[in-house]
Amino acid sequence: MHVPVMPAEAIELLAIRPEGVYLDATAGLGGHSGLIARQLTTGTVIANDRDTRSLEMARANTAEWSDRMCFHYGSFGSLSDAVSQAGFEKVDGLLADLGVSRYQLTAPDRGFSFMADGPLDMRMDASIQTTAADLVNHTDEKTLADLIYQMGEERRARRIARAIVRARPLRSTLHLADVVERAVPRTGRLHPATKTFMALRMAVNDEPGELRRLLEIAPGLLKSGGRMVVISFMSSDDRMVKEKFKELGQSKQATILTKHPLQPSDEESFNNPASRSAKLRALEMR
């Protein structure tokens, strides 16, 4: 079972009401959705995800509360449809966890990770046309370097892009990881290919664009007094969330509930290393 990140903090800031309607924009394997559902009586959780396999697992993992659950397959751009198709106009709370689940990272056929060999896919949604293999094999060197630098925050992006272009064609995750490691040897605890893989995943799934769409759509889906909680793992994502929240606060549309982002406790970071870089921000619509 996927362990949800910062569960206590997220649930507290959502201020769950037993009869409320809550949209989990990133249901994943259902960790946060289940925590919300168990606090409801006549309320509803709308569990949304763009990964069909994850959504089916979320359905199975929340079966105990099936009478309180609705499921919707789609990207952030379709969240309005998720709410209306569940029979509601607005919600009392919205949660978005921008991380990648352990299931996605460890399933070799998904191609998200170099922990096992697999195809260079990285698509969260099978309807996406471009795969990671397309990017590494057909993108020009400068564009590839810019992508790795900007999305992966990888300072050695030019050297990595040069090595990738020279090694073409690349067909598997371990092949790519080996090429990157040869170009930029390990200097710390992180595998040298970690940021490159992250950048490719973000590009394939247009994660920056998806986050922008979420931040534009979400305020209009929340009732007055409705709360929005976002958990991000990249500094670039956290900056986008911070700026949007600041804009909503300054325009008096919302009250920011987290003056500074919350971070996992030492205990959580130890027990769930995937949570270490998490930052949680929350607001309440006026």
UniProtKB/Swiss-Prot annotation:
Q: What Gene3D superfamilies has UniProt attached to this entry? A: Putative methyltransferase TM0872, insert domain (1.10.150.170), Vaccinia Virus protein VP39 (3.40.50.150)
One record GO biological process = rRNA base methylation
The residues the record assigns to binding S-adenosyl-L-methionine are G30, G31, H32, D49, F88, D97, Q104
Which Gene Ontology molecular-function terms are recorded? rRNA (cytosine-N4-)-methyltransferase activity
Q: Keywords assigned by UniProt?
A: Cytoplasm, Methyltransferase, rRNA processing, S-adenosyl-L-methionine, Transferase
Q: Does the keyword Transferase apply?
A: yes
What is a single cellular component term in the Gene Ontology annotation?
cytoplasm
Q: One Pfam family this chain carries?
A: Methyltransf_5
According to the UniProt record, where is the region Disordered? 260-286
Catalytic reaction annotation: cytidine(1402) in 16S rRNA + S-adenosyl-L-methionine = N(4)-methylcytidine(1402) in 16S rRNA + S-adenosyl-L-homocysteine + H(+)
Summarize the protein's role.
Specifically methylates the N4 position of cytidine in position 1402 (C1402) of 16S rRNA.
Name the UniProt record assigns to this protein: Ribosomal RNA small subunit methyltransferase H
